[in-house]
């Protein structure tokens, strides 16, 4: 489909070779499926060594992140940047994103390896409480929002681990309240995630005006707020405006994969309409602008398929373990592709590896439940 879009977009700014090699990701997803099948049927002895290794690495990140949060720098000497905790990732600022993307895999492994949840209840509560807190203190707003959407859906559909996650979320809320009241730590994630986001969405209208609900000026200020409402921020609105222009130029096939970036390069990042960047910072907007209506049909159909299968899975007469595994990875894949939050570049190598890895695990779990 991407090849079709690239070559059909006659005036596309996208080098065709950027789409020629995208086929490696579907191959990667199928490879994950075959590897899981092979290990299950041939040599895989279900022990929890892999989970122990992952838990150890994650716990190290917890410790390092808290050291950076409390003292201002981590054990490697990396300091807090832009009010965000990054731990060993340094200037990359992807700690929250990394942890969020690992969360579905960890939960999937817990069910796949048949870990005794009741026996390890207290350990799991401590682990997931710290997990959610570290995503919060990382200051990554998108990861924090997606984590909450993911957890809401898991709590709704996966009964087995519902209580543990709810207790962990309660402890997260208590931590947020305590950190705001006591003001400890060298960064202020509450301000970044909640206050700054609100000010960006309202374009600082409330920040710049004192609202008195008892006078006539209040009505004018409220009207001004409505006029200045932004989708996430002024920059995001600028990206979406430019993406809308590219979509209108070629609505069927779009500007081609990575077309937003190459258009911005062609105008030296000084577009007459909107604001240039490397990508539109939203999956839905990017797919519409770069792959057009054709790409949108595939994207929307994929999300709809995931929702339908999540709902139908609950009625399948299969092992509870297999159903829980399928629900976890389905929700993880759906939330990773969620269209209503800021996002990275859909065609980015790291994100593509993550999404197609999820797809490979999804295909494996799908076979267990629906075949």
Where do the model's predicted regions map?
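Long extracytoplasmic/lumenal interhelical loops at the membrane interface
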Residues: 219-291
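Interfacial transmembrane-helix termini
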Residues: 1-27, 39-47, 64-93, 136, ...
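Perimembrane helix-loop junctions in membrane proteins
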Residues: 5-8, 41, 68-79, 113-116, ...
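A membrane-periplasm/extracellular boundary helix in multi-pass inner-membrane enzymes
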Residues: 63, 67, 158-227, 241-249, ...
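Hydrophobic transmembrane alpha-helices and their immediate junctions
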Residues: 155-157, 161-165, 290-335
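Transmembrane alpha-helices of multi-pass inner-membrane enzymes
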Residues: 151-152, 302-305, 326-371
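Loop-to-helix entry and N-terminal half of a specific, functionally important transmembrane alpha helix
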Residues: 123, 127, 278, 282, ...
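Alpha-helical transmembrane segments of multi-pass inner-membrane proteins
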Residues: 27-34, 46-80, 89-161, 166-181, ...
């Amino acid at each position: 489909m991407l090849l079709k879009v690239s070559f059909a977009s006659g005036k596309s700014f996208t080098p065709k070779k950027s789409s020629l090699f995208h086929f490696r990701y579907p191959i990667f997803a199928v490879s994950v499926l075959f590897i899981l099948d092979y290990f299950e049927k041939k040599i895989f002895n279900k022990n929890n060594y892999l989970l122990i290794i992952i838990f150890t690495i994650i716990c190290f990140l917890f410790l390092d992140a808290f050291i950076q949060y409390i003292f201002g720098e981590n054990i490697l000497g990396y300091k807090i940047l832009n009010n965000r905790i990054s731990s060993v990732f340094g200037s990359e600022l992807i700690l929250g994103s990394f942890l969020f993307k690992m969360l579905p895999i960890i939960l999937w492994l817990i069910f796949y390896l048949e870990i005794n949840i009741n026996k390890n209840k207290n350990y799991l509560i401590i682990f997931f409480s710290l997990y959610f807190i570290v995503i919060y203190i990382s200051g990554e707003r998108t990861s924090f929002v997606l984590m909450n959407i993911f957890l809401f859906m898991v709590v709704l559909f996966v009964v087995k681990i519902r209580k543990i996650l709810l207790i962990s979320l309660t402890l997260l809320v208590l931590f947020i309240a305590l950190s705001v009241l006591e003001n400890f730590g060298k960064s202020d994630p509450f301000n970044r995630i909640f206050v700054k986001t609100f000010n960006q969405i309202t374009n600082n209208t409330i920040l710049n005006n004192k609202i008195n609900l008892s006078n006539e000026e209040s009505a004018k200020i409220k009207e001004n707020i409505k006029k200045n409402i932004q989708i996430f921020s002024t920059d995001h609105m600028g990206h979406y405006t430019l993406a809308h222009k590219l979509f209108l130029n070629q609505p069927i096939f779009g500007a081609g994969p990575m077309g937003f970036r190459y258009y911005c390069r062609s105008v030296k990042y000084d577009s007459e309409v909107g604001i240039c960047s490397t990508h539109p910072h939203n999956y839905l907007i990017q797919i519409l602008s770069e792959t057009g209506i054709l790409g949108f049909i595939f994207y929307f159909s994929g999300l709809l398929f995931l929702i339908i299968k999540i709902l139908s899975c609950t009625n399948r007469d299969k092992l509870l373990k297999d159903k829980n595994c399928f629900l976890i990875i389905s929700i993880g894949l759906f939330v990773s592709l969620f269209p209503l939050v800021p996002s990275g570049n859909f065609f980015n190598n790291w994100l593509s590896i993550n999404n197609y890895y999820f797809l490979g695990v999804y295909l494996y779990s799908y076979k267990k439940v629906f075949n």
